Amino acid sequence: MEGPEVTDGDNVLNLTHLGLENLNLELVSENKRKDVQQILLPHNRLVVLPPLVASFIHLHLLDISNNNMVYIGEEILGLTKLKTLLAKNNRLDEFSFPKEMGGMRLEVLNLSGNRFEEIPDQFLQIPTLKSLSLGGNRLKSIPAEIENLISLEFLYLGGNFISSIPSELANLPYLSYLVLCDNRIQSIPPQLAQVHSLRSLSLHNNLLTYLPREILSLVHLHELSLRGNPLVVRFVRDLTYTPPTLLELAGRTIKSHGIPYCPWELPENLLRYLDLASKCPNPKCSGVYFDCCVRQIKFVDFCGKYRLPLMHYLCSPECSSPCGSTSHSESDSEDEVNVAARRMQKVLLG
């Protein structure tokens, strides 16, 4: 039997579409192993990698997609120069990898089309990771520890069973592309608006009924995909309004009327509470609110073509217009509409 094909100046070991069930790397000479930078193994029948793969000390890319892989052992840890690991469409799950991967220098990890029910902790130990793809798995949640991937730019989690988005995603300073389509997400955390590097946000085919108004502050967002969501208007008067507490009423009175006070004149809990005031977004209202507020859906134009329902928080039911959830209301801010149209250059709704 002839040895595996080594091409492109002895840098690429190409073994695609050969129906291999076992990988005999002993046929590759020791000198050649040191030169190989890419190993391509897609469309075979491999179940595991042989330990000898660790001898490819200059390997940058390993593609084992479209096999029957169930396990990737600790030999992967010996590939200290590995930047890209592609293992799409296998039978891998959260128990298929070494428990400690923090020493790896991976930048691209694609494990879409496998059997993951949760994102393994060891993936969240790789600070160099720039691209993580786990689409088409069985994920039910995104762990808060996702914030540990401080270099992450691309996150693909489409086609899972995710129902919520953790606010910790806002702590990823370089995140530019976030794909969460085809899940079961019902709401977007307002903190997501802090990801100012975000350029593309795919949320189509979820269970969204509104968007938080904070999304307007995503100044670099060029693509927003929302097709296939209910986006059902929920009228504010259909919601139960809980009366403010005495503490909130006191805070509102002081803030709204600008009543002067000295620190020793007020209880300590009220002093701390006053710092938590939020201004009512109704331009005709000068009031504030703390814990008690009324939710209102307001439509905002994007690109002069689409109208998106954004969630507003008002200080009381009196601040909501009877027409607040129709095409225009008296409390609509033309500035917000113009800014939104300018910032959202491409809204994918169809």
UniProtKB/Swiss-Prot annotation:
LRR repeat ranges? 14-34, 35-56, 58-80, 81-102, 105-125, 128-149, 151-173, 174-195, 197-218, 220-240
At the top level, the lineage of the source is Eukaryota
Pfam families this protein is in? LRR_8
Q: Which UniProt keywords apply?
A: Leucine-rich repeat, Repeat
Q: Does the keyword Repeat apply?
A: yes
| GO cellular component, as recorded | cytoplasm
Q: Which InterPro entries match?
A: Leu-rich_rpt (IPR001611), Leu-rich_rpt_typical-subtyp (IPR003591), LRR_dom_sf (IPR032675), LRR_domain-containing (IPR050216)
Name this polypeptide is given: Leucine-rich repeat-containing protein 58
